[in-house]
């Protein structure tokens, strides 16, 4: 439903130079049903960047893949590496001792090609030099794209799929009825959508041919699956679709009927050592520094941000969901105005949802 608060948030973001395109939305559970409001560029498909990670985690939870399975059971390139013997849950919870990022796409910069097997092995060997020794709950939490790249590949191979987005389409997107509103580039284009006209443009990258439109912005995701979603990034979505995903996650966590039925509680539970959970992040406690979630969402809120300027937050106590999607990297990632804008924007959406 069109909502003035969402339109106002989008307008302020645009006029403040945060991003050329902004879509905002909120949802609240009241009187046994979900109420929603959206505004701004609703209907535009945004590159969700790392907001793909919660979808991947839910896909793992809803598959037959066990979170206690070792990575090397499913990804042969990981066998004999420091990561191969770790359970998938630690990869999803950013507690596998992996580097945050490795430039797996580097061969493309010099006209080479990507050897996917070599890339997966390289990712699995990327143990941080300061990782230390693991405890029963894994290594100290360090945010890592690589863990999701590897967990996504484990999911794909377990399900007999080419890439994780095929599994997510069946396990998450189809049950939500969001085909055409949420998916990888190839899935959306297979439904006849022209992403060149309905996807928000992202960065102007000369080595990739200029302004990126309808293809994932993340370099590693593009290198590993040019039109797919390897696990850490690659999905596109409308703000209404991201809200619907958040609603279904909260319904499942609360034990209500949900298209995403199954045990998702292990994904969102708090873990020792930091705010990072499996597929989601949590709010920093007062005194631990600023939080992009703002001040209105409760202390137990969980969600995720995306590098392209996207976000999803879920408050399980107030039973509200907020999302903001932007293309803040257009035309350049150097625009970081969103860092100051996110808290007040999330506050405005959460206040509206609370009414």
Which residues does each PLM region occupy?
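Hydrophobic (often cysteine-bearing) scaffold residues that line and stabilize catalytic clefts
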Residues: 2-5, 48, 52, 56, ...
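A short, well-structured edge-of-sheet supersecondary motif
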Residues: 7-48, 58-59, 67, 107-110, ...
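Short, positively charged
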Residues: 1-8, 288-295, 348-355
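Structured C-terminal helix/loop/strand segments within mature extracytoplasmic catalytic/sensor domains
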Residues: 303-355
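Short, glycine/proline-biased beta-turn/loop segments that scaffold the active-site neighborhood
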Residues: 67-82, 175-176
């Amino acid at each position: 439903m069109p909502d003035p608060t969402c339109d106002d948030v989008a307008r302020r973001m645009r006029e403040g130079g945060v991003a050329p395109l902004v879509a905002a939305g909120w949802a609240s559970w009241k009187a046994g049903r979900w109420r929603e409001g959206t505004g701004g560029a609703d209907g535009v498909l945004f590159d969700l960047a790392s907001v793909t990670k919660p979808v991947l985690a839910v896909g793992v939870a809803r598959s037959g893949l066990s979170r206690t399975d070792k990575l090397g059971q499913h990804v042969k390139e990981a066998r004999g590496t420091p990561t191969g013997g770790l359970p998938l849950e630690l990869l999803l919870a950013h507690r596998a001792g992996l580097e945050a990022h490795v430039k797996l796409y580097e061969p493309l910069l010099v006209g080479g090609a990507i050897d996917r097997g070599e890339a997966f092995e390289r990712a699995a060997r990327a143990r941080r030099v300061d990782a230390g020794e693991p405890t029963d709950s894994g290594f100290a939490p360090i945010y890592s794209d690589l863990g999701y790249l590897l967990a996504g590949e484990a999911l794909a191979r377990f399900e007999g799929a080419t890439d994780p987005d095929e599994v997510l389409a069946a396990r998450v997107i189809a049950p939500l009825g969001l085909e055409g509103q949420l998916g990888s580039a190839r899935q959306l284009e297979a439904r006849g959508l022209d992403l060149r006209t309905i996807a928000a443009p992202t960065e102007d990258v000369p080595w990739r041919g200029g302004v990126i439109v309808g293809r994932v912005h993340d370099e590693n995701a593009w290198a590993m699956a040019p039109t797919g979603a390897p696990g850490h990034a690659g999905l596109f979505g409308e703000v209404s679709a991201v809200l619907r995903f958040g609603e279904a996650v909260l319904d499942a966590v609360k034990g209500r009927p949900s298209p995403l039925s199954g045990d998702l509680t292990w994904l969102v539970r708090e873990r020792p050592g930091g705010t990072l959970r499996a597929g989601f992040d949590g709010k920093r406690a007062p005194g631990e520094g600023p939080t992009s979630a703002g001040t209105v969402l409760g202390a137990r809120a969980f969600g995720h941000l995306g590098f392209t300027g996207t976000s999803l937050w879920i408050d399980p106590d107030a039973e509200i969901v907020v999302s903001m999607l932007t293309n803040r990297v257009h035309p350049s990632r150097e625009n970081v105005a969103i860092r100051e804008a996110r808290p007040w924007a999330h506050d405005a959406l959460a206040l509206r949802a609370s009414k």
